[in-house]
Structure formats: structure tokens, C-alpha cells
């Protein structure tokens, strides 16, 4: 695990090449076909060195949940183990890792009619009014969910309207945890400013590789929009808005880099509270040796 641009892929490839391992991607952007540059998807050369499972498994118009990931990952883990190999799960989508390790609550599926109803209420009265509703039905979730987070706010209210139970109540019951012994590692630079520099450098490389053209091709399909999970991935939203003329090129770069740094900050916040985690420093010599020693 680790924040974006921390060197997870390079270490995973080294591990796969030198030991009897197969890689499973744990990344909510890499699942989408046609989103290669902006998601920092491993190159063809890297995939030849170490194939990644759960990459390119969905169209950007499709949804993919943590429950979908857990089911897919469990199947891949079982298959890799049956081949006499060790699964290596690599990525930065902490919600996926958490779902896999701890199990998931039996939440109801999305209801498009109720979602539309909630959106109409938000359009009429504002998200603050809906947040007040959430405080009445689920004060614990209301403490965690900010009024400016419409996706999570809408989902919490939707769950209550479908089931008659609060999100807090339902999340207290979870499916069985992962039935395997897991050794967990996180990799990140020692200093945050180093990570920030790496993020900026990587985004500039993405632009040189043709990221704007990639987003333009996705936009030209006509069936994608900014409310889809795929198009909410960092970088894609900002580039889409630039192509829509909402701001100039320099502002797009600034906003995309800032959004990526915010993502890295959230990832690090998750990791700092993660139990039983072994830390590695990005770029440090001997990371693979340290990792293998901890796995014995």
C-alpha cells in the first residue's frame, strides 16, 4: 500500500521477478479500459515483466464497488494460491484494501429513483438541508460526512430510505474477514515535500505522454460524464473541465496536481491509522530484502 507516486509498482515488479509471486492491482482507476496515462497504469513493458490482475476489467461507463473488488480479489487470490504462488496486492485504494481484509457490511444496492429524488431535494434546498436530515436519522454518520461531500451524504440518506436502518447500524455487521494470513506493507517518502515533487513531475510526464488526448477521446464517446466514478479520478476531472473551457491550461495543471496531492494526503491519513503495518521508505536500498525478511 502507499500514496500515489510512492514507488509501489516498481517494488512489486521487483518482487514478482525475483520470487514466485503474482500481482493483483488494488486501484479504483486501473480497473478502467482506455484510462492508461492519467491512471499511471503500468506500461506494456512493465506488464510483461509482471502481469497485473484486475486491470482493464471495466468500461469507464460502468460502476465498480468495493464489494465487486472483494469478490474479484478473493477469486484471484484463490487461483494464484492454487498455482503454488504467492499473491501480492498492490495499490492505493485503501477502501478496497479495507473491504478485502475486514469484510463488508450488507448494504442495499443503489436505487436510481431514490438517488434522483435526493438530488432533486439538493437542487431545491441545498446539501446543507440534507445534512440536517442525516443528523436526525444518523448522527454518527453526520459527524463523519461533510455537507460538501454530496456523494457520501447522498449514499447515507439513500441507505436509510431503502432499508429503514441507518448506515451506522448496518455497518456494525460485516461479512467474514479475509481467510488468509496477510503481511502488510506501506511505502512512502520520508518527507512530504519529496512526495509533492514526485506528484508534480509525474503529472508533467503524463501530459507529455498525451494525457489531454486520452481525455479528449473519452469525452468524444458521448456516453461519459463527470458524475461517473471513472471521470472523478484525479486528473481526469480537471482535464475534462479544461477541455470544456472552464479554465486555462496552467490552471488545469495546478488544479490536477493539487487534487493529486490531496489524494496522497488522504491515503497517508488512512495508512497512519492502519494496524499491523510495516513501513518502507520510497527509493531506499534494501526494501525488497526488508520485505522478504518480514514475510518469513
From Swiss-Prot:
Family to which the UniProt record says this protein belongs: Belongs to the IPP transferase family.
EC number of the protein: 2.5.1.75
Subunit and interaction comment: Monomer.
Positions with a binding annotation for substrate: 4-9
Pfam families associated with the record: IPPT
Site, Interaction with substrate tRNA: residue positions: 93, 115
Enzyme class per UniProt: transferase
Protein name according to UniProt: tRNA dimethylallyltransferase
List of residues binding ATP: 2-9
InterPro entries hit by this protein: Dimethylallyltransferase, IPT, P-loop_NTPase
Region (Interaction with substrate tRNA): 27-30, 151-155, 232-237
Protein's job: Catalyzes the transfer of a dimethylallyl group onto the adenine at position 37 in tRNAs that read codons beginning with uridine, leading to the formation of N6-(dimethylallyl)adenosine (i(6)A).
Keywords of the record: ATP-binding, Magnesium, Nucleotide-binding, Transferase, tRNA processing
Disulfide topology: none
Amino acid at each position: 500500500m502507499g500514496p500515489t507516486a510512492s514507488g509501489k509498482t516498481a517494488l512489486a515488479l521487483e518482487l514478482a521477478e525475483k520470487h514466485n509471486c503474482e500481482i493483483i492491482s488494488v486501484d479504483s482507476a486501473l480497473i478502467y479500459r482506455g484510462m492508461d496515462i492519467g491512471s499511471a497504469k503500468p506500461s506494456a513493458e512493465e506488464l510483461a515483466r509482471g502481469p497485473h490482475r484486475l486491470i482493464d476489467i471495466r468500461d469507464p461507463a460502468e460502476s465498480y464497488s468495493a464489494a465487486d473488488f472483494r469478490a474479484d480479489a478473493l477469486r484471484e487470490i484463490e487461483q494464484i494460491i492454487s498455482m503454488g504462488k504467492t499473491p501480492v496486492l498492490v495499490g492505493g485504494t485503501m477502501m478496497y484494501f479495507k473491504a478485502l481484509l475486514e469484510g463488508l457490511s450488507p448494504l442495499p444496492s443503489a436505487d436510481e429513483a431514490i438517488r434522483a429524488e435526493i438530488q432533486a431535494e439538493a437542487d431545491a434546498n441545498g446539501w446543507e438541508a440534507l445534512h440536517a436530515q442525516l443528523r436526525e436519522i444518523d448522527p454518527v454518520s453526520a459527524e463523519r460526512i461533510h455537507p460538501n461531500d454530496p456523494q457520501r451524504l447522498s449514499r447515507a440518506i439513500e441507505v436509510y430510505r431503502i432499508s429503514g436502518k441507518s448506515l451506522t447500524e448496518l455497518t456494525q455487521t460485516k461479512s467474514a474477514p479475509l481467510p488468509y494470513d496477510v503481511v502488510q506493507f506501506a511505502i512512502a517518502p520520508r518527507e512530504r515535500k519529496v512526495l509533492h515533487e514526485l506528484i508534480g513531475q509525474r503529472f508533467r510526464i503524463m501530459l507529455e505522454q498525451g494525457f489531454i488526448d486520452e481525455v479528449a477521446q473519452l469525452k468524444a464517446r458521448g456516453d461519459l460524464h463527470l458524475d461517473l466514478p471513472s471521470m472523478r479520478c484525479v486528473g481526469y476531472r480537471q482535464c475534462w473541465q479544461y477541455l470544456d473551457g472552464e479554465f486555462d491550461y496552467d490552471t488545469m495543471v495546478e488544479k490536477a496536481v493539487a487534487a493529486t496531492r490531496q489524494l496522497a494526503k488522504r491515503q497517508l491519513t488512512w495508512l497512519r491509522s492502519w494496524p499491523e503495518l510495516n513501513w518502507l521508505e520510497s527509493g531506499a536500498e534494501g526494501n525488497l530484502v526488508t520485505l522478504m525478511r518480514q514475510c518469513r
